[in-house]
Amino acid sequence: MTISSAHPETEPKWWKEATIYQIYPASFKDSNNDGWGDMKGIASKLEYIKELGTDAIWISPFYDSPQDDMGYDIANYEKVWPTYGTNEDCFALIEKTHKLGMKFITDLVINHCSSEHEWFKESRSSKTNPKRDWFFWRPPKGYDAEGKPIPPNNWRSYFGGSAWTFDEKTQEFYLRLFCSTQPDLNWENEDCRKAIYESAVGYWLDHGVDGFRIDVGSLYSKVAGLPDAPVIDENSKWQLSDPFTMNGPRIHEFHQEMNKFIRNRVKDGREIMTVGEMRHATDETKRLYTSASRHELSELFNFSHTDVGTSPKFRQNLIPYELKDWKVALAELFRYVNGTDCWSTIYLENHDQPRSITRFGDDSPKNRVISGKLLSVLLVSLSGTLYVYQGQELGEINFKNWPIEKYEDVEVRNNYDAIKEEHGENSKEMKRFLEAIALISRDHARTPMQWSREEPNAGFSGPNAKPWFYLNESFREGINAEDESKDPNSVLNFWKEALRFRKAHKDITVYGYDFEFIDLDNKKLFSFTKKYDNKTLFAALNFSSDSIDFTIPNNSSSFKLEFGNYPRSEVDASSRTLKPWEGRIYISE
């Protein structure tokens, strides 16, 4: 590969070229029939992940936790949750991952911890405790007519209701942007930061991890004084705190400090990658986070494309959108990198998103497989580090027509309760909320992995176990690893082919630059070009159930059809008509 001086982003790195497979440990594979996935279960399926063509695994939180938010409420950063196994099980998993030639990435949840963490127990014990300032404690703003304490400001929790919880013992509120058992850590306190680095980062670096996915990494720096947020949702007394909590005044300083800690801690020469979850940021802010010369993050996750079609006031309200909106939002993931020393990520699914075929494709029996393959064609053609979430490679779809009682996610439950209290169970607000969660709830991604059509647990647990969460009934319809591995036309086998294509053409698929839309306003066609050295990649993707026409850029005869989601025997490479949900990638040299 030729590194272009005009495109420093093309400097090769393992974490740029890797396809990273995300594992949600509770739902991946249960080895001991207690209904929960575990470390030994993951270890038993590493060969499956390797054979898919992925190069690294990222495991969502496996630390000791009360599990109020599925492990994103950590009580001990240096201990594996016993249900998942022991620390030794985890060390063995890291070793096996490395023996198979893959990297091991773990989740870093350090904006907040669990209220069961010793740090918080000490902090809440008295107003004079040395760790009191490790969290955000504030007196009530006042008391209402019934004598109840009023929260210090109007910030809304991401999970509904106020972002403050009152502590009876010391008669003060503590800040928790998520659920009431997830108190926010005060990064302004240097002793607190040092403890975070040592316990949550240093311990796992010492045990061989290759990188960290940094949970809500834009929230560490809160604006001094914690002022009231502007009112953008007139229907609620609680408002989004983003202007005062996201990408705050010291956020880059904090990430540089943590990055320096990582570089100083690792003595064996391995290069550690970090990927920050940065929900929304301007292009300039993204460049500040990921510029190699600034030593903050390797890359980041942006939510522009997954938030399309949802209200900025409240994500669990759906709003209309067109393909053009999604195209533009998707390009926001990587266009800021062009001609810089920055880097980006490409993804459609994770533990916080629904199934992409339901969300952006067509999950009907007729079009599920072909539209799932189309999304794969799109992903492997875009520049950046590619992430694949467990079950995505099977073409999993959202569960259908589940009552609210079957939902497990604390975000759904808390918002349901808040809307019920504020507007009523039969209100229009509740109707909109229920419509939204059927499409975008996080629970769609969290059902147990579908390994086979074995009743009743799809091979996730033994037949006599009771899984921690309901299974998606689609495992009975052929959406499972065992059936798909035997079917040459399955989504699973297509993903293997797609990842081979991406690796074979990594110069232009992974590192390609100068991305340009073709026919951006087209409501059915997603088409673009990008370049690398003397090569040009042209993609034509039909996001509809109709046949549509397209044109090759400049009608050039130099473009050769290299990849697509219909069998090559069914495709006329000279045709300029795409079948329903057909995607093609052409390359000219």
From Swiss-Prot:
This protein's name: Oligo-1,6-glucosidase IMA3
Site residues by UniProt (Transition state stabilizer): D352
Classification lineage: Eukaryota, Fungi, Dikarya, Ascomycota, Saccharomycotina
Recorded family membership: Belongs to the glycosyl hydrolase 13 family.
Catalytic activity: Hydrolysis of (1->6)-alpha-D-glucosidic linkages in some oligosaccharides produced from starch and glycogen by alpha-amylase, and in isomaltose
General remark: Present with 166 molecules/cell in log phase SD medium.
Biological source species: Saccharomyces cerevisiae (strain ATCC 204508 / S288c)
EC number: 3.2.1.10
Domain of life per record: Eukaryota
